[in-house]
Regions:
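Short beta-strand element of the alpha/beta-hydrolase
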Residues: 11-18
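Primarily recognizes the serine-hydrolase "nucleophile elbow" in alpha/beta-hydrolase
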Residues: 63-127, 142
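Conserved alpha/beta-hydrolase "acid-adjacent" motif
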Residues: 167-176
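Short beta-strand/loop motif that positions the catalytic acidic residue
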Residues: 154, 160-162, 166
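Mobile cap/lid helix-loop segments that gate and shape the active-site cleft of serine hydrolases
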Residues: 116-150, 156
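A fold-wide structural signal in alpha/beta-hydrolase
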Residues: 12, 40-44
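Catalytic nucleophile-loop/oxyanion-hole region of alpha/beta-hydrolase
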Residues: 24-27, 31-32, 44-75, 203-209
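C-terminal catalytic histidine-bearing segment of alpha/beta-hydrolase fold enzymes
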Residues: 175-227
Length: 227
């Protein structure tokens, strides 16, 4: 954890709750920000617009990244669950603004994706696809909103976790993104737990999946975000 001379922490993580781009889960919001605060991190919850088509959520998340950075935070990370994981990954991986100053302001320095929707091409969370791009979206639009298709060698580090028996968002989504990151030489951690339904949030009392917060804290320490 680092701080400016004026006392403002230089690192900040924005939490993006899930909800299938239809609504937003309170369980994946303030409790998660409180956990991050317990690690000594500056954090906030951003309730991005739902029931609106692409690029509405992407533009809103990037505007929030710019706002947080303008407040004095040098490094900005995103942590998202399910559809919020897609929103986090999309803001991290989609092409940046052509203007160098704007691109620097909206850049994401680290991403934590929890049971994320990754691909709009694979079988996916129907609500997410319906709300974001529509079930009749063109192949081009489906590809351009699939995170695994957007990975480049400029991507930041990623932490991803999922459960093998997730019936809402198949675990193949996590594997797809991890494979794309590996193919491009991007540092990343992937944890897949055998048991657990979709939407576990902090996974307290949920078997092995409860380890994700401990594993993530260790990863954040390794990446230099916490002491």
């Amino acid at each position: 954890m680092r701080a400016h001379h004026n006392g403002v922490m230089t690192d900040h993580i924005i939490v993006l709750p899930g909800g299938g781009y239809t609504d937003l889960s309170d369980d994946e919001a303030e409790p998660v920000a409180a956990w991050l605060a317990g690690l000594g991190l500056s954090s906030s919850v951003f309730r991005y617009p739902v029931q609106t088509r692409h690029p509405g959520p992407l533009d809103a998340v990037r505007a929030e990244v710019r706002r947080i950075r303008a407040d004095g935070h040098e490094r900005v990370g995103l942590l998202g669950f399910s559809a919020g994981g897609h929103a986090a990954g999309h803001a991290t991986l989609a092409p940046l603004s052509a203007d160098p100053d704007a691109a620097a302001a909206e850049r994401v320095d680290l991403a934590i994706l929890c049971y994320p929707v990754v691909s709009m091409e694979l079988p996916t969370h129907a609500d997410s696809r319906r709300q974001l791009i529509g079930l009749d979206a063109t192949p081009e639009l489906r590809a351009s909103t699939s995170l695994d298709r957007l990975v480049t060698r400029d991507a930041p580090p990623f932490f991803i976790w999922h459960t093998a028996e997730d019936a809402s968002v198949p675990v193949q989504h996590a594997y797809l993104l991890a494979t794309a990151l590996a193919d491009h030489g991007i540092p990343h951690a992937l944890h897949v737990f055998s048991r657990g339904r979709h939407g576990l949030n902090l996974a307290i009392g949920q078997g092995d999946a409860e380890q994700w917060t401990t594993l993530c804290a260790a990863w954040l320490r390794e990446e230099g975000w916490i002491a």
